[in-house]
Amino acid sequence: MRNVCSVLRVLCVVSLTGLQASCITINLLEPSGPVQEVQLSGTGEGKVLLLDFSGMISSQDKDGLIPQPNMLATFKEELTRASKDEKVKAVVVRINSPGGTVTASDILYHELREFKVKKKIPVIASMMDVAASGGYYLAMASDAILVHPSTVTGSIGVIMLTVNAKGLLEKVGVEASAITSSPRKDMGSPFRTMTPEERAIFQGVIDSFYQRFLSVVQAGRPNLSAEQIKKLADGRIYSGEQAKAAGLVDDIGYLDDALELAKKKAGLAEARIVTYGRRGEYQNNIYSRLFATGTGFASMANFDLLSMVRGGTPQFMYLWMP
């Protein structure tokens, strides 16, 4: 009976991946337009901008009834608008993400760091439920990091998930074959067993991306030595208190504390707290957008996990994926 269930599961996966590949996305409503400024609280001439970064880090577009730009495009749009606003004196980036793809994580880090250098204003990272792996990578572009007491962070490292479905497919009489120009062309295929030589090649790529992660942490946490960072960067997660004790973050604090720190670093006695949103989004306080957009692991449903079993490109991830 157990073997029958396994076969049925394989057939379901194959069917679903086929359906997904042939799906057509139909957008019934018009795009929601450019981001607009929304004032949340405070008074004064200067502004502290609150930016939200929630969910899986990916360059995939957000399809649905209301099409949205991917998170890289949205983040760039927000930073571009802020760079042109002389009244924006500080930025708080609220992070709630388990990470995502290596390249998308690095692009976000690069864009935020370039913005900070050119704008010459303080940037504070405020970590929510999860700011792990790629989420922590992004925080390295900030001037200070505050975490909630219940935040989970860390997971410094790289992962590439592959699936070997050869044995299961053999049980249902399915055989996959690839015609290639060279022996390594189908490395990582889920339809055959990976050779030791191929595993070593993948490991070399992962090691390279891991060294990149370490160098970014070194630049963002100059208080830590290279030896300390290497010891902390074994992939484990940390609570907010543990991360502070290890020197991975600066302090324990809530979003209000991050906003106050931003005002202090910008030399503002008072300031307007503003954020950006699109048409149709209701935001009346500093927590509105966080729970309206879908965050953390809830957003993992939007990630194309099926690509890992349908022969898609293996994903190199800065991702906490227990």
Q: What name fits each language-model region?
A:
Residues 132-133, 152-156:
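Short gly/pro/ser/thr-enriched loop/turn and capping motifs at secondary-structure boundaries
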Residues 2-125, 130-131, 140-148, 159-322:
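N-terminal organellar transit peptides
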